[in-house]
């Protein structure tokens, strides 16, 4: 919850935000067949308000510069030209959370890489062990640029109906032959084909007979190859 405040979430919204994600995240996992029996949520303010944690925040700050914090937070926090101090505290607390949550691994998108490196470099200076850091690619937005929470057309929201999802994908930017910044292809690669592989299923691209009829793919790489060669296109 407190991390949200450090990244400009209004204080009055924090508790509602926490309850929302606590309710939604298990449903996401269940929708793809994950057993959530051992899933546990830890509220940040339950341990981040304790004296020892705050002391470590101060201690951590003596090992890093303002520029170190700015660099670490640059792809995650909305800093702007005149950043608030809160945004510079953010990477310090995210790093310390590894120790205070006693985790073996921290997982995040590739936009988190600078904070993850920051944690690995600085935690040992406080006498804490570095953790394993795992990153996965971010899916580009559906309008040909980075996905943005402020632009509903650029993303598929957790609360979107089936009709909304179909409408957004139907109106997505999908330049023929181009793979870079193609949100539709990324959605296929990292989500659809992953689910198909887990279920030992093939992906069927439905087409009218006048366009060659249906095409079946066992893997994403073959689909991408055909897309680049414009054998298939929007």
What are the functions of these language-model segments?
Residues 1, 35, 40-43, 157, ...:
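Poly-acidic low-complexity segments
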Residues 1-8:
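RNase H catalytic domain
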Residues 4, 105, 155:
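Short, flexible active-site loop motifs that bind/organize anionic cofactors or intermediates
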Residues 95, 101, 113-234:
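Conserved nucleotide- and phosphate/pyrophosphate-binding catalytic cores
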Residues 9-12, 147:
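Short low-complexity, flexible loop/linker segments enriched in glycine and/or proline
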Residues 4, 71-72, 148, 167:
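Generic signal for short, ordered secondary-structure residues
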Residues 11-135:
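Divalent-metal (Mg2+/Mn2+/Ca2+)-assisted nucleotide/phosphate chemistry catalytic cores
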């Amino acid at each position: 919850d407190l991390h949200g405040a450090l990244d400009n979430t209004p204080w009055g919204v924090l508790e509602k935000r926490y309850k929302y994600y606590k309710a939604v995240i298990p449903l996401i996992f269940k929708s793809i067949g994950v057993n959530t029996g051992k899933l546990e949520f830890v509220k940040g303010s339950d341990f981040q308000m304790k004296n020892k944690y705050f002391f470590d925040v101060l201690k951590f700050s003596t090992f890093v510069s303002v520029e170190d914090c700015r660099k670490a937070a640059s792809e995650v926090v909305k800093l702007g030209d005149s950043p608030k101090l809160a945004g510079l505290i953010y990477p310090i607390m995210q790093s310390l959370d590894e120790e205070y949550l006693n985790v073996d691994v921290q997982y995040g998108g590739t936009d988190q890489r600078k904070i993850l490196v920051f944690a690995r470099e600085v935690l040992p200076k406080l006498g804490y062990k570095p953790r394993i850091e795992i990153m996965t690619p971010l899916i580009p937005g559906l309008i040909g640029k980075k996905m943005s929470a402020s632009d509903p057309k650029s993303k598929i929201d957790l609360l979107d109906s089936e009709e909304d999802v179909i409408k957004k994908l139907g109106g997505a930017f999908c330049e023929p032959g181009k793979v870079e910044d193609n949100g539709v292809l990324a959605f296929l690669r990292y989500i659809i084909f992953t689910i198909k592989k887990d279920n030992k299923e093939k992906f069927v691209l439905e087409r009218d007979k006048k366009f060659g009829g249906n095409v079946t793919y066992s893997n994403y790489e073959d689909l991408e190859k055909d897309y680049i060669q414009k054998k298939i296109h929007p």
